[in-house]
């Protein structure tokens, strides 16, 4: 009975978090007056959308930028991943940590940091006399800025695939007369194809859903993307709910088409080593190529991490931007202002930390139950539970925000979380649910199928087996996922902009508003603290995962 209740409650929570927002987007897109309670004029919003002169620019800009980011991410991440996975590099874990930082840094903060560094009268021009304003505010500049945040997904996909599969098959090919290049081309690269395809698709998906970078750089570059268009339809008066819903469906269609196209190009084949479980991969010695390889890794790390970090820290300790880079202009007053009891910073920080903690606890519990019901209990309807729990991984944040607005801003609800902090909590939980599902699912696969049946033989109920056996064993993975959720939720931007109640700010909204108001130093001081907090949480999560792996 208790298990049936848990199954029903889990499915109901997933329907509320994931399915209903998507259903209401679809209803609003089909019936333009649905928000007013009318089902008339079906598909009446489509002609207005097609007549929008901005539509070709939004769709074309989204596809151009996303394709460029995916391509350049492969160009950077593939060779670096090969260096890390196939060869013996000095301090290999240091490179992994270095390339985690761009993925951890909120893209909008990176974009603002690049602006301060490269624009006219920016730090580069002050220090060297050069400026890259024209490159920064262009399509190519937007692609590069986004790529420096996104390429780690390709790097880690490639390097982890190589570290897992080893290089023994390539060595066998060399023994049988193949050249190094031929062995790589015909043996190693095909083994990499699934991981490379997954990384490329993820890079494309992350690019099409990005809001902060095109919002910060796009207007001066003449580039508009679908995410920015959706936000404008909700932020500008009069609010265009049908237009926002239709653009959200279009954005989802782009993501699904990319997934379908990749499956057509790559196929559903799986590449498997026939040698059994690979042993530890120590990597091939590079010899005289070690220094060039290290320099290449350091150059990418310097651009992806060093430039934004230095720009961020410089801005946070400069009294005024007009004062330039000088010792006389150094101050800590921006950091002191964050802790001013009469300011908005402490309130924003408290709001973000509370929401992040709530999100981590809720999705941790829901993700644990979903993974356990699907993989261990194998309940009826487990396919639906699995699909709903992982679907948010393919949903852009702006789409989730639109769906929640359309769902809860309806007159028939007796009580609604609309225009309260509960909306932010719902959005964070929806977006970040796949993290604990994947982490716990991976841990459950490693446990094997015999532990819980053994507990059942000795009289334990399914819930007792979950509480006394399964939970202690998967807890390190669950805690790591919850820390990741906390770190990401504490700096989420687009849903915070769409759903924050009037007069309430999160850390991300605070930073964004500081730039809009010209208080750049205080915004970057908050960004520095946010990045440091996220990095500490990320390192803690990695340590927990490593401990679980060793155990």
PLM segments and residue spans:
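Glycine-rich helix-loop "coupling/hinge" segments at transmembrane-helix boundaries
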Residues: 212-238, 324-328, 493-520
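Alpha-helical transmembrane segments of integral membrane proteins
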Residues: 260-296
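Polytopic alpha-helical membrane proteins, predominantly small-molecule transporters/carriers
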Residues: 59, 177-178
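The alpha-helix within a helix-turn-helix
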Residues: 173-174, 455
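Juxtamembrane helix-boundary/capping and inter-helix hinge elements in multi-pass membrane proteins
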Residues: 87-91, 163-168, 178-180, 221-222, ...
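A short amphipathic helical element positioned immediately N-terminal to and/or at the very start
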Residues: 41-51, 184, 330-340
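Short cytosolic juxtamembrane segments of multi-pass membrane proteins
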Residues: 169, 270-282, 451, 544-551
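Membrane-water interface segments at the C-terminal ends of transmembrane alpha-helices
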Residues: 2-35, 51-163, 191-212, 216, ...
């Amino acid at each position: 009975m208790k298990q049936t209740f848990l199954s029903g409650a889990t499915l109901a929570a997933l329907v509320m978090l994931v399915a209903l927002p998507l259903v209401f987007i679809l209803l609003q897109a089909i019936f333009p007056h649905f928000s007013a309670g009318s089902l008339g004029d079906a598909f009446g919003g489509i002609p207005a959308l097609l007549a929008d002169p901005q539509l070709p620019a939004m769709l074309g800009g989204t596809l151009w930028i996303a394709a460029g980011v995916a391509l350049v991410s492969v160009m950077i991440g593939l060779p670096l991943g090969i260096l890390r996975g196939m060869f013996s590099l000095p301090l290999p874990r240091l490179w992994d940590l270095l390339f985690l930082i761009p993925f951890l840094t909120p893209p909008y903060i990176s974009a603002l940091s690049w602006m301060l560094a490269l624009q006219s009268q920016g730090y580069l021009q002050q220090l060297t006399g050069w400026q890259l304003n024209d490159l920064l505010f262009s399509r190519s500049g937007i692609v590069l800025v986004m790529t420096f945040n996104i390429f780690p997904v390709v790097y880690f996909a490639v390097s982890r695939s190589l570290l897992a599969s080893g290089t023994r098959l390539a060595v066998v090919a060399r023994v049988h007369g193949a050249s190094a290049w031929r062995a790589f081309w015909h043996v190693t690269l095909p083994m990499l194809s699934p991981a490379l395809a997954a990384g490329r698709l993820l890079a494309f998906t992350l690019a099409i859903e990005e809001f902060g970078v095109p919002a910060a750089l796009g207007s001066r570059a003449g580039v508009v993307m679908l995410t920015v268009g959706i936000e404008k339809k909700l932020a500008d008066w009069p609010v265009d709910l049908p237009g926002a819903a239709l653009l959200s469906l279009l954005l989802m269609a782009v993501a699904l088409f990319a997934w379908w196209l990749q499956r057509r190009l790559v196929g559903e084949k799986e590449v498997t080593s026939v040698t059994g479980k690979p042993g530890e991969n120590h990597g091939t010695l590079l010899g005289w190529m070690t220094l060039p390889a290290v320099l290449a890794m350091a150059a990418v790390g310097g651009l992806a991490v060093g430039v934004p970090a230095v720009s961020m820290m410089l801005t946070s300790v400069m009294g005024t931007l007009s004062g330039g880079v000088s010792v006389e202009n150094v101050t800590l007053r921006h950091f002191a202002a964050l802790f001013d009891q009469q300011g908005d910073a402490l309130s924003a920080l408290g709001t973000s930390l509370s929401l992040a903690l709530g999100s981590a606890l809720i999705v941790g519990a829901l993700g644990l139950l979903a993974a356990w019901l699907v993989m261990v209990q194998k309940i009826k309807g487990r396919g639906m539970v699995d699909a709903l729990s992982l679907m948010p991984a393919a949903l852009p944040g702006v789409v989730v925000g639109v769906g929640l607005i359309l769902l809860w801003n309806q007159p028939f609800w007796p009580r609604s979380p609309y225009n309260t902090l509960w909306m932010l909590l719902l959005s964070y939980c929806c977006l970040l649910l796949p993290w604990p599902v994947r982490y716990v699912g991976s841990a459950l696969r490693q446990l094997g199928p015999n532990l819980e049946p053994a507990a059942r033989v000795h009289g334990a109920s399914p819930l007792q087996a979950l509480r006394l056996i399964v939970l202690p064993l998967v807890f390190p993975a669950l805690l790591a996922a919850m820390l990741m959720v906390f770190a990401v939720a504490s700096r989420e931007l687009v849903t915070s902009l769409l759903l924050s109640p009037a007069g309430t700010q999160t850390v991300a909204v605070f930073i964004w508003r500081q730039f809009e108001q010209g208080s750049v130093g205080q915004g970057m001081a908050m960004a520095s603290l946010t990045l440091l907090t996220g990095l500490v949480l990320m390192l803690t999560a990695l340590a927990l995962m490593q401990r679980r792996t060793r155990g």
